[in-house]
């Protein structure tokens, strides 16, 4: 599935060659994904190296299989986006933050996320939240940062407030992942730099 997201329309044999997974296993897994509506057969292409062989059947991502909410937490705003599983934005809103004591709390964030979730016209599969700091999977309650503004911001409280899978990651890592999946000029290996309050670099390989 990662190969299809990264490369676009691709044949089963090309997936097998790129991943070193056996063609039989690739065929079995992709057939199951087609049945589940994750992938669809987008057309055929000729194999230039083997003109006498069968045409390759290309697989692509079904854009309307699942819908997700993505959110970014920052000092100045909370943003919420509703997307399909190809990253197309269906709805988006931002809440500016003025009063730090009230707005920079997990309770206020939850209230705004619940508002956005209730307004969604489609069923949501999961929620992803980009953090202004690191996320520690062992001590998963707080944003790992030296910024005192987030010391009372409880990630565990946020996760427990919703009956959906909730995922956290550093905001620059999220930007780099988006670049990998959706940029038309993507490369297999690149560095993504973000200059803000500090400098952060994410390495994709």
Which residues are covered by each model-predicted region?
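Short amphipathic alpha-helical interface segments
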Residues: 1-10
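Gly/Thr-rich phosphate-binding beta-strand-loop-beta motif of the actin/hexokinase/Hsp70
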Residues: 53-90, 191-205
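Conserved phosphate-binding catalytic cores of ATP/NTP-utilizing and phosphoryl-transfer enzymes
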Residues: 41-66, 168-195
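A short alpha-helical element within helix-turn-helix/winged-helix DNA-binding domains
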Residues: 9, 14-17
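Glycine-rich phosphate-binding loop and adjoining helix at the ATP-binding site
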Residues: 93-189
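Short beta-strand(s) of the beta-wing in winged-helix/HTH DNA-binding folds
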Residues: 11, 40-41
